[in-house]
Curated annotation (Swiss-Prot):
Gene it is expressed from: atpF
Identification of the protein by name: ATP synthase subunit b
Its membrane topology: Single-pass membrane protein
Main location: membrane
Key words, A-Z: ATP synthesis, Cell membrane, CF(0), Hydrogen ion transport, Ion transport, Membrane, Transmembrane, Transmembrane helix, Transport
Amino acid sequence: MYLDYLVLGAGASKFNNGDIIATLAIFLVLMFLLKKVAWGPLMGIMQQREELVASEIEAAEKARKESHQFLEEQKSLLKEARTEAQSIVEGAKKQGELQKDEILTAARNEANRLKESALREIESEKEKAIAAVRDEVVSLSVLAASKVLSKEISEADNRALIEETIAKAGEAR
């Protein structure tokens, strides 16, 4: 057991006050030196690290806000582009309808013009046919009348007489 006391450096009932004071003094000097040499720089490094982390958090927050603002701007621009595209499509539809109406109106007018032209041409051809038939009837009537009467009257007198008769017949209708 004696050996245990030697190893530990103390006796069982004996306190060495000088050793206690020396140990305490060395501890305090060592703490002072650690504070000056190690604790100050260590705390400075920790402070710098804390500031770096805070600035990175602040930068990340700023970037998040900027990206959110950019996203909102992009949404706004997209909405504006969609609205503009919709108005262009609607304008094109209206323009298409107007052009369709103009084309239909022009086609109807052309059809009416062609119809009226055809009716005038038909009327003209009808008048020509009636005049030709009249001339033929007059010629045949003169020929028939001259054969019936066996005498020949002047063709001009006979034609005038027949035209007068046909005109009276036309008025009677």
